[in-house]
């Protein structure tokens, strides 16, 4: 026993219950970097799932010369990103020769002639597709590592998918027990876990009273997908802002419209012509979200992360600089 317990057990790859998957064998983001790391690139690979992990590994293997097929349950790649980011990534992957199959249920996996056959069904039309590959990589999301905690023996509440439920101070439903990182929900980013650890440490050891407590907020949590092209984003997508009831304004600027883009040989209309998209509240001039896709996107969006965390409006910031 202890007066304070902090749970940070992380998460595992979510392995879907697909008939034949266990018998055929598969890779995950964990096992790939262990005993199953290939001595040479696979000739062909099917990636099941197209969130950040799926599209990142799809890019890595494609760059190594593997014939890659990405099979996605959703109608979009990286569906939690802004829709225009997803569409731009799809166009670029297909232009590179990556086979992307969207809106699919994986119904069966079998072995045939030394290969693995992934059988999928279109969720709208019911059309069956068979994809023969040398290897399969499962990238179907993250599940919390809670099995060995035996939470059923405690009063700790969990969410429908098994994540540990916490309040704004990262405390569970049991006083004195906290949870941080992948175990308390998505998004599964290391910097989110670091941020939550800072909050818990401050509140437990440095706050003099409850008025000094810090609380977790994720509306300006930045994230990057290291696909090709990269995607960097912070805040609300355009669709999320509209759904939230804001008077939404959108601004876009393409790489081809800048000196840097011109120097890189990017022309208007090129499939690799990335862009910056800013979503604002027209009533207050506050930035609600910023999204960028293209070379060095992970660097380009950082000033907007700082600006959104500062709370100032773009017009105010510009005037102060002047």
Segments the model singles out, each with a brief description of its role:
Residues 1-25, 29, 43-44:
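Glycine/serine-rich phosphate-binding loop and adjoining beta1-alpha1 elements at the start
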Residues 2-10, 47-48, 68, 131-141, ...:
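Short hydrophobic core segments
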Residues 9, 28-30, 102-104, 160, ...:
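Short loop/edge segments at beta-strand edges and connector loops
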Residues 22-41, 130-210, 305:
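FAD-site-proximal beta/loop scaffold in flavoenzymes
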Residues 34, 42-46, 52-127, 187-194, ...:
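Rossmann-like dinucleotide-binding cores of NAD(P)H-dependent redox enzymes
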Residues 112, 148, 155-157, 264-273:
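Short loop/turn motifs at secondary-structure junctions and domain boundaries
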Residues 123, 159, 167-168, 238, ...:
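Short, acidic, Ser/Thr-enriched surface-loop or helix-capping motifs
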Residues 226-322:
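Flexible, glycine-rich terminal cap/loop adjacent to redox cofactors
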